[in-house]
Amino acid sequence: MKTKIIVIVGPTAVGKTALSIEVAKAFNGQIISGDSQQVYRGLNIGTAKIRPEEQEGISHYLLDVRDVGESYSAYDFVTEATQAIREIEAQGQLPIICGGTGLYIQSLLEGYHLGGSVPHEEILAYRAQLDSWSDEDLFGKIAELGIEIPQINRRRAMRALEIAHLGGQLENNLPDYEALLICLDDKREKLYERINQRVDLMIEDGLLEEARWLFDKAPTSQASKGIGYKELFPYFAGQVSLEEAVDKLKQNTRRFAKRQLTWFRNRMSVTFYQVGNPDYKNQVMEDIKNFLDK
């Protein structure tokens, strides 16, 4: 029997973390972070990492598991999240994945992962190329390569071509998990307003000092390429004013939120919940209960 898991995704600043705590408390769960930046020790403010006092006694996995000079990939995430799910299940508790890194979460849920040597950026670039192909082009390439796919559709065809092109291995044809995918959303103007406010609060909370530490310690690392840090590096180098850097950070975060929503909408079978709906949490809880009772 497949392991049932809850997955909470959505754009940055929409309220995923707070909801994950409520779900964990209501359904005896533990939380696995699905965020590519929160794995890094020392990057707390810019990644909006949940603080220990906010965890309310709920165990969290895949936070602070790498130093900032180290790399982290979808391969690493799938390997470590799989182990975390096993540990949580062995304790008789519910695994809850919460985060906004669609590539990582999708790789876990679809039952395969690409080889650990494939850079994140290369995967994204090839996926963008496949996105531009018509169904006819995709299925034609599948036939040309002699790839056999049960119940072929566009999504499966794209996965198979990614694996063939990037040299990964299909570990499972079917996923190991039965997942309920919850995607939080909000009206654009509300979400963007929260993003701008969050950035201002991050600056007040010490983001400049945190980013400066990263700039001095590992300026060319994978960690330094994350939104929240790279925008401030030109300020440290004396190339732009602080106001310009912060404006760029807000702009990049808004654009990132838009890309996240596009990913979840087009690549994952999620159910959307509007956080502006005063009853949305009750609906989430009811849907989780029904899912677990099946």
Swiss-Prot record:
Residues marked Interaction with substrate tRNA (site): 101, 127
InterPro entries: Dimethylallyltransferase (IPR039657), IPT (IPR018022), P-loop_NTPase (IPR027417)
Cofactor(s) required, per the database record: Mg(2+)
Protein's UniProt keywords contain ATP-binding: yes
Keywords assigned: ATP-binding, Magnesium, Nucleotide-binding, Transferase, tRNA processing
Region (Interaction with substrate tRNA) residue spans: 35-38
Binding residues annotated for ATP, in chain numbering: 10-17
GO molecular function, one term: tRNA dimethylallyltransferase activity
EC number, UniProt record: 2.5.1.75
GO biological process, one term: tRNA modification
Signal peptide: none
Reactions this protein catalyses: adenosine(37) in tRNA + dimethylallyl diphosphate = N(6)-dimethylallyladenosine(37) in tRNA + diphosphate
Keyword Transferase included in the entry's annotation: yes
Binding residues annotated for substrate, in chain numbering: 12-17
Function of the molecule: Catalyzes the transfer of a dimethylallyl group onto the adenine at position 37 in tRNAs that read codons beginning with uridine, leading to the formation of N6-(dimethylallyl)adenosine (i(6)A).
Subunit composition and interactions: Monomer.
Family to which the UniProt record says this protein belongs: Belongs to the IPP transferase family.
The name this protein goes by in its record: tRNA dimethylallyltransferase
UniProt organism field: Streptococcus gordonii (strain Challis / ATCC 35105 / BCRC 15272 / CH1 / DL1 / V288)
